[in-house]
Amino acid sequence: MMVAWWSLFLYGLQVAAPALAATPADWRSQSIYFLLTDRFARTDGSTTATCNTADRKYCGGTWQGIIDKLDYIQGMGFTAIWITPVTAQLPQTTAYGDAYHGYWQQDIYSLNENYGTADDLKALSSALHERGMYLMVDVVANHMGYDGAGSSVDYSVFKPFSSQDYFHPFCLIQNYEDQTQVEDCWLGDNTVSLPDLDTTKDVVKNEWYDWVGSLVSNYSIDGLRIDTVKHVQKDFWPGYNKAAGVYCIGEVLDGDPAYTCPYQNVMDGVLNYPIYYPLLNAFKSTSGSMDDLYNMINTVKSDCPDSTLLGTFVENHDNPRFASYTNDIALAKNVAAFIILNDGIPIIYAGQEQHYAGGNDPANREATWLSGYPTDSELYKLIASANAIRNYAISKDTGFVTYKNWPIYKDDTTIAMRKGTDGSQIVTILSNKGASGDSYTLSLSGAGYTAGQQLTEVIGCTTVTVGSDGNVPVPMAGGLPRVLYPTEKLAGSKICSSS
């Protein structure tokens, strides 16, 4: 059987066991595969078990199922997984279906038995650590979940927050421009209400701080993704982050860097929604704006406390999948390459590698097993190649992860950027011309390479030579991304079969 170069490289690189209590600095070097536990893999290994997203029901994914498919994840070069919340949920099938996603918790001290047992979760953590990989777990501090109207909640079902005293008075958020409403009123509606915990109260705050430290310790968790961060007052978060003792990345669902970036002053990182919107718009069609993306890269770099600790993504369970906008595989390859080679921590959502095309929730929560987990799909291979060069650059250049991505070129259809210390930099050239894009040579200045230097384009495994003027002649065709790295630096790496 022929084994791809990137497979040999990736398995060779990921051998070091993670340190206890993974720090923000440790997480800079990671690449995250995000999955909904219920939708990724089943214990029985089925690739045909029905999962109708419109039903919004449990489909049978488990922690053991994830363990059994870690080869598939690691084969793409990912060094970490992020799984959805593990706490026990409301048990009813509501008008909106089951709490299969994990965001309608009722008992924070019990696990969701649909996913498995405590031993299963510990086994998942151990299996990851044996591979040198990290475990990130999703957590919710803002709210609980109740099957019914907010005005008639039976608070006794919540553990440990078993009385109304722990919660803000019921009111639904009407105006998202009013931060007081955003923090004090409730998400959800009167069909499934999300009772909003009053995190200004010491009894609530202390309970959460004790709980999160225990969760991390009990299951050897390396990092946390925190849901609905903007719905909790900022002064709650530093203590929570400290109590967790690991890297925390928060969901602040807002594309304005002036709103989102300051949350990095109260926790380690946030999901990079400011980049998400211009990134999506640049590549979801062949007429997208490269100007907006170019400008936002620079804005985030200058305005966020540390852009190298943000999470870069274009898909998740809350937003429509990229392929719901366009089925052009070349555009999908470009956006995936950007995610992996931009500043910060790359996040790819399960199914993105198989070009899943679900739109809004619940359509974007497809079962990964129905793809059959092929490892020869176009995007699987592209993601593996991009992760491979990123992982390799990190291993060879101590400054790679803290070097801030520098856009060096743009035109109506192209953006180029460099990241990494002089002599070891990766230069990425992205196009939104799409699969029908023409063939031409881009003369690229500002890459920082030396005249006559040979570069390897690691996606297609071709080489180019830097011109006498220092410009790089980059062959472009079919709208595909190009990723350049000094050929001499690849010796012994197995990347593009370098010996």
From Swiss-Prot:
InterPro entries: A-amylase-like (IPR013777), A_amylase_C_dom (IPR015340), Alpha_amylase (IPR006046), Glyco_hydro_13_cat_dom (IPR006047), Glyco_hydro_b (IPR013780), Glycoside_hydrolase_SF (IPR017853). One of its GO terms (cellular component) is extracellular region. Ca(2+) 2 binds at residues 227, 251. Its cofactor is Ca(2+). It comes from the Eukaryota. Pfam families: A_amylase_dom_C, Alpha-amylase. Its EC number is 3.2.1.1. Binds 2 calcium ions per subunit. Calcium is inhibitory at high concentrations. It catalyses: Endohydrolysis of (1->4)-alpha-D-glucosidic linkages in polysaccharides containing three or more (1->4)-alpha-linked D-glucose units. One of its GO terms (molecular function) is calcium ion binding. One of its GO terms (biological process) is carbohydrate catabolic process. Residues 1-21 form the signal peptide. CDD domains: AmyAc_euk_AmyA. Its main location: secreted. The record marks 318 as: Transition state stabilizer. The keyword Calcium applies. Ca(2+) 1 binds at residues 142, 183, 196, 231. It is found in: Secreted. Substrate binds at residues 104, 143, 225, 230-231, 255, 365. Glycans are attached at residue 218. The active site is at residues 227, 251. Keywords: Calcium, Carbohydrate metabolism, Disulfide bond, Glycoprotein, Glycosidase, Hydrolase, Metal-binding, Secreted, Signal. Disulfide bonds join 51-59, 171-185, 261-304, 461-496. Belongs to the glycosyl hydrolase 13 family. Monomer. This is Alpha-amylase A type-3. It comes from Aspergillus oryzae (strain ATCC 42149 / RIB 40). The gene is amy3.
